[in-house]
Amino acid sequence: MDKYVCKVATVDEMNNKWDYEINHATKNKENWIIWKKENIERFQNGFIIPYYGILNKKIICECTAALNSLVVQNAEGLVDKRTAYLTGFRTISEYQGKGYFSKLFKFMIEDLKNRGYEKVTIGVEPNESKNKEIYFKYGFNEHIKDSKEFYPNGTEIDVEYYGKKL
């Protein structure tokens, strides 16, 4: 029988997940290496909460809640004492469309509510229509602003930001 668990990640689980991402990156591997170091440090400093969906001891989906403006680009209006910024929505392709991420998302929202958060925000690239459709389904209907973000290697992307009250 399949056993699926939603949880806040441990540092060991984060190391395993990031090593997997680095080893499977087909391009911009340097970004993944930087993100691993940054995210583990941010978790240890209480700036983020990483959430994992684990099926039969395998991490199959994830999302991270950023809790501090120091770790969010264009942070104004996106993160504060009562607003968490959600990032890194990922599900391994063979598990997509099977409800696993939906369960993780519900777990994360309940956990953030229990921690006193009243709103969550996200960023999405304008051309990511599939992701935007999913986010709208999850209730991210409040357009906050548009801006640009930068990857560690200098890549610049356009981003639309949306919010959802909890």
Label each residue range with its predicted role.
Residues 11, 24-88, 92-93, 105:
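Acetyl-CoA-dependent GNAT
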Residues 122-132, 149-153:
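Conserved beta-strand-loop-alpha-helix junction that forms the acyl-donor binding cleft
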Residues 48, 156-161:
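Short hydrophobic/aromatic beta-strand or adjacent loop that forms the aromatic wall/cage
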Residues 95, 99-107:
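Conserved acetyl-CoA pyrophosphate-binding loop and the N-cap/start of the following alpha-helix
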Residues 112-124:
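Conserved GNAT acetyl-CoA-binding A-motif
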Residues 102, 127-144:
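Conserved active-site alpha-helix within GNAT-family acetyltransferase domains
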Residues 1-16, 20, 166:
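Conserved N-terminal entry element of GNAT/NAT acetyltransferase domains
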